[in-house]
C-alpha cells in the first residue's frame, strides 16, 4: 500500500495511540517497543499495544499486540490488515506476524536504530548468532510478506506534506529518545532476561 495518506496515518497511530501506551509501559519497567494493527480499507485502528515483558518475556510489542488482537471477539482477516511496528521486528516477532497470516508490516525504527539509539542490540545479535545474518540480511520481501520502512514512505511524499511528516517524525524520535533514557536508567532493576 502506498496511498498518499498511509505515511501520515501510520505516524499518527504511533504518536497518538502507541506512544501513550509505551510511556505507561516504560514507567513500569518495560522496553520501548510497540505495535498496532489497522484496516487496509480505511486505515482505522483495530488494536494498539506495547511491550509487556515484565509479565512475560515473550510479550514483545508485536506479539503482545497479536495476543490482544486474538482476544477480540470479531476480528477481520489478517490479509485485510496492516501490521505496524514501532521498531523493525525481531526474528520471534517476524515469525509471529508470519504465522498470523499478515502479508505486510511497516516499521518506524530499524534494527540498527534499536542497537545504536536504544542500546538494545539483541535483534541483530540473534540474527547473527542464530541465523548467520548480517544487519538487513533477511528477505524483506518474500513469499509471506513485504516489509516497509515508514521513512521511505515519507520520502515518497510531496511537499508540503513531506515537510510536515518529517517534523512529526522528529517529534516521535524525540519522544522515543526520552522513553529510552528512562528505560535504560531503570533496567538494572528488572528481571527481563535480555534487558
Model-derived features: where do they sit?
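Zinc-dependent deaminase
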Residues: 1-25, 100-195
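Short, flexible loop/turn motifs enriched in small residues
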Residues: 28-32
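Short beta-strand scaffold segments in enzyme catalytic cores
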Residues: 33-40
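Flexible, active-site-proximal loop/turn residues at the rims of small-molecule/cofactor binding pockets
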Residues: 42, 89, 111
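Short beta->alpha transition motifs characteristic of CBS
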Residues: 46-54
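Short, acidic/turn-prone active-site loops that include or flank metal/cofactor-
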Residues: 53-55, 63, 109-114
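Mobile, glycine- and charge-enriched loop segments
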Residues: 62-87, 177-195
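Local cysteine-cluster metal-coordination motifs and their immediate loop/turn environment
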Residues: 84-103
Amino acid at each position: 500500500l502506498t496511498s498518499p495518506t498511509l505515511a501520515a496515518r501510520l505516524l499518527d497511530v504511533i504518536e497518538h495511540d502507541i506512544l501513550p501506551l509505551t510511556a505507561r509501559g516504560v514507567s513500569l519497567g518495560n522496553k520501548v517497543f510497540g505495535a498496532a494493527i489497522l484496516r487496509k480499507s480505511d486505515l482505522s485502528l483495530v488494536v494498539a499495544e506495547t511491550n509487556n515483558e515484565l509479565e512475560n518475556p515473550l510479550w514483545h510489542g508485536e506479539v503482545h499486540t497479536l495476543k490482544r488482537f486474538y482476544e477480540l471477539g470479531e476480528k477481520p482477516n489478517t490479509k485485510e490488515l496492516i501490521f505496524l511496528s514501532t521498531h523493525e521486528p525481531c526474528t520471534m516477532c517476524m515469525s509471529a506476524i508470519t504465522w498470523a497470516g499478515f502479508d505486510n508490516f511497516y516499521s518506524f525504527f530499524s534494527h540498527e536504530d534499536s542497537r545504536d539509539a536504544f542500546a538494545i542490540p539483541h535483534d541483530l545479535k540473534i540474527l547473527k548468532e542464530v541465523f548467520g545474518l548480517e544487519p538487513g540480511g533477511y528477505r524483506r520481501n518474500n513469499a509471506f510478506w513485504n516489509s516497509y520502512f515508514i521513512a521511505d514512505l515519507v520520502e515518497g511524499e510531496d511537499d508540503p506534506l513531506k515537510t510536515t511528516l518529517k517534523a512529526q517524525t522528529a517529534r516521535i524520535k524525540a519522544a522515543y529518545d526520552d522513553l529510552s533514557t528512562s528505560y535504560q536508567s531503570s533496567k538494572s532493576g528488572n528481571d527481563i532476561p535480555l534487558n
